[in-house]
Each structure stands twice: as structure tokens, then as C-alpha cells.
């Protein structure tokens, strides 16, 4: 409603301005030229009215005669003359005798203000428009006219309700930050032994591990002013704005000291300085220089603690990482199985769970998941249960949600020919069988499916029994054999292969090359690393390439070893699938019948046992529900609402 009122007011002002301009420019309002009385009488008495200027008409208002002179050369002009009171009647008689039209006009007795307002209206309109324009610039969070002001948001305790009780799985990071909170609450406890509070804390870790959540917990626990800002809020298109915002941010911090300033994604402003297109005059470098000075420069900022977060510590400038600026570097790693169990318990506090839900089993089945992944898993499980009109979330919902998170959503509407479906079944059966036969050196098979998920026509999902922190050579070689299993199965069954193994070959080639050049797993090359990373400083080390620091002979040996690893894996997969051709056929047949096989069913097929019976869970889509509801309403309109049967 407020916006509509503003629009209506704007249209009213535009219409009034148009009327004022129209009145100002109308012929009646044009100013008349004052002339001498003799000139007026001469033009009144002109006889040759087709050649010389002559008077066409006269308007008499009080003692002022306004007359219109028609000049054949220059057109009509408006002139006026003021007559004395004694000879007004005689002059009027002369005008009438010369056959000039005479008009009498009453003296204007209207008030002064309406006319003044009409003349002042354009100026008022321009002032109002300028005021509205300035308010529009100042509106919102941008504040376009306050370029040099900091955009940091001061969070109050009422705005933030996250505490350390809501953080799980990263106990070491919590301990480090809780010590800083304790220092802020009781500084004398540490200062009596000569200790000082850390000036800065840098949280580093992969995306989704909980760095920003830790910062929100600090804001909820600190009991001191907490400023929050993103690294991208400093740099603008205008030169000097970033440095000005840094100064303003620390000025606010000094006024509210002791306080905490949190800079999220600090790599946006703290990237490595170096030679580039911008040189030393780059706006980002000016902002970084000002940030370095404010954090630990000539002037001290006692009581202002900087907490920053980044998932790219490798791109940060060394000057910002030194002690005195960031005294502590806290690595927020992926949680282990106990950490994942704790995160699951935090995120399921408000979710009604079924009696069959086991947090320990879920935690073991989600290796590599970070906090954001686990939160997404719980949310997907709750949504799946809601779509089935359940009252609680069961273990089946969590398993289906895990498959969706790991492998992508099912694309059951995708039309696949029987031939392609059969090829996909044998391809995935080859992966699964090789992985099962090499289970001593590889991760167990979690699920095999020929239902398209994401960009893939089928998937074989392997999950480790426990967190894997390193990789042996036997594991790497087994991984190569599993990757080759799909292509080899196509060769054995169909005598040819398809493009479906393209991604498998790419993964195998990358792994084999890393085994040779990085991990030292080749007996021929030895434990030597070849091809050091060449990092571009100006581009933020995003575009990296491996510099060739070896001879042509070594390059040929590397290529030969990569080829040998892959061909050996191909041969091993062929031998395993040839020796177990019958199991391969049973796996492919079961996939064509059931479309998806879990670990228990794969074990039963490989072990020669009968497949266990299962109840297929079909989640209705919203389009199916709408269609069913329409059919129900249509039937009710035709046959009427069915009455319940009488009880016997």
C-alpha cells in the first residue's frame, strides 16, 4: 500500500507540473511589450492594413490597453500601453472610429497566492523529486551514498540463539574458541600470568564443516558485541572504498571494545599479493594493505578480536597469516564416525524418529559427510516421510535420503530402450562383481542400480566400513580393477563396448597417473614426485598446472607405467569376470528384474543363495497425487459421495 501511495503522489505531481507549464507557455500568458502612446495611436489610425503593421484588437483593463498588432512580415505581436484617466474616453472613441475591435476585461481581484503557487509549482516539484531520489538511494542495506561506510552487522543476543551446544563433531575447534570466550569474560585469570588474548583466529577447512556455525556460536556465547561481515563486502568498483570500509569497521570495533569481528570468506579480500595486471594499485591490494595495518600496525587495537573463516587457506597472503594478526589457526576437518553421530543427534532434535532409527548405523554409513551434508540428509528424510503421510521418520526414509544425496535423484521418467537397459545392467554388474571379489582390498558394495540418477544411466555405490585416511597400493590397484569392470563386462557379453565407460576410464587414468607421479607406487619410477604444481598468484591459484620438471625419457617412462597399471587392472577384471561368468549373469538378471540391489542382495547372489523378499517402497509424486485427487472429485460429481456400509 505504501508503494501505491507513492506512485499516486508521483502521478499527481506530474499532472500539476504539466498544467503549470502549459499555462506558462499559453499565448494568453505571454508577456506584452510596453510601447509609447504615440506608436499605439499611429498603428490604430493606419489605413493600408494589408501592407503596414496595424492594430487588430484592443483589450481594455482599467487604464491598461493591451493590443494585438498584425505585422505582415513578422506576424502578430502583443503590446500594451498605459493611458491617463483624463483622456480615456476620447482614446476609446478614436479606436472605435478606426473600426478596431474593443474588448473590456474586469479588473483581477483574485488572491495573490493561487497565482504564486502555480508559478512556484515546477520548483517545488523538482525539489520533491530530488528528495525522493535521495531517499531511494539511501533505502535498503546498500546505502548507495555511504560508499565508504562499513557494512558490518552488529548482532545482538536476541538475534542469535546458536550456542556451542548446537555444535557437534568438531570438539577440538570448540575447545580453542571456548578459551577465547573465557578470556573475554575473565581476562584477569590469564593476564596475571603474563598471557594476552589472541588478536586473531583463522578457521580453515572444507566447505560445510561448520566454520560459520562456530562463528554464530561465538556470537551467542561471547557476551560482547559481535560484528559480522563478508570478505566480498569490502571491495567495490570505486577506488579506495575497500580501504575506507576497513578503517570504518575497526573504528566501530574500537568504540565497542572488547568485541569480536567475524570476517567470512576472508579469501575474497586476503588473496596473495603479487605481480599482475593491477600491480600495486589494485583495489583488492589496497584493501588488504589497510586490513594488515588495522590488524597489527602502528596503532594497537586492544580488545578487538578478529575471527575469520576460509576454505582456501592456500591463496591467503603470508603477511595476514603471521602471528600477531592470526595467532591461532584452527583446522575444522571432516567429522569422524563419532562426530557424525553427534551431528545427527543435533539435527534430529526436532524430528520425530521411528523406533528403528539407529544413529550409530547412520553415522557408520555416511563416511566423508560433513555437517552440511548430514543436515541435508536429515531434511531429505523428513521430506520423504512427509510425502508418504507418515507420523515419524523411519530408517527406510534415511536410507532413501542417503541414496538421493550420494547418487542424485532418480529419473524414472527417462525413456531407455531395452537394449541400452540390458547393456547398463551388465556394465553395473561388472563393477559390482569385481568390487565384491576384491572386497579384501576395496570398499564394500553399498548399492547397485540401473535407474538413471543425475547424469548417469546406472551407478555402483561403494561405502567404506570406516573412515579412510590413507590409501595403500593394493587398494589403489583394486580401485583401478573395479573401474575397468564395467567396460570388461561389456566386452565379454556383447563383444564390444560403449561410451558408458568414458568416465570410468577418465577416473582410472587420473588415479594411475597420481600413483606414478605423486604417490611413488611405481617400481620403475620409484619414490620420486614429478610435475610440481605451478600456481598463478594473480589468479588466486585457481588455475593451476603441473610444471614439467623432468626429461623426455622420464616422461616416456611415466606414460608406460600409467599404461601398465591400467592394462594390468583391465586384465585382472577380465580374469575375474570370465571365471565368474555365471554370477555376472545372475547379477545382471536380478538388476533387470529389481532395478536396484542393496548390499545384502548382492551378497546373496554372489554366495549362490536365494534373493530375500522385499517390499518395494513407492513414493508418490505430487503430480500423481493431484491426478488421483482430480479423479476422486470427478467420480464424486458423477456418482455422488459413497456412503459407508452399515455395520452388522
Curated annotation (Swiss-Prot):
Stated family: In the central section; belongs to the AAA ATPase family. In the C-terminal section; belongs to the peptidase M41 family.
Annotated SMART domains: AAA
The protein's name in its UniProt record: ATP-dependent zinc metalloprotease FtsH 4
Keywords: ATP-binding, Cell inner membrane, Cell membrane, Hydrolase, Membrane, Metal-binding, Metalloprotease, Nucleotide-binding, Protease, Transmembrane, Transmembrane helix, Zinc
Domain of life: Bacteria
Subunit structure: Homohexamer.
Topological region Periplasmic: 28-111
Co-factor(s): Zn(2+)
Keyword DNA-binding annotated: no
GO-annotated molecular function: ATP binding; ATP hydrolysis activity; ATP-dependent peptidase activity; metalloendopeptidase activity; zinc ion binding
Membrane topology type: Multi-pass membrane protein
A GO BP annotation: protein catabolic process
GO cellular component: plasma membrane
Function per UniProt: Acts as a processive, ATP-dependent zinc metallopeptidase for both cytoplasmic and membrane proteins. Plays a role in the quality control of integral membrane proteins.
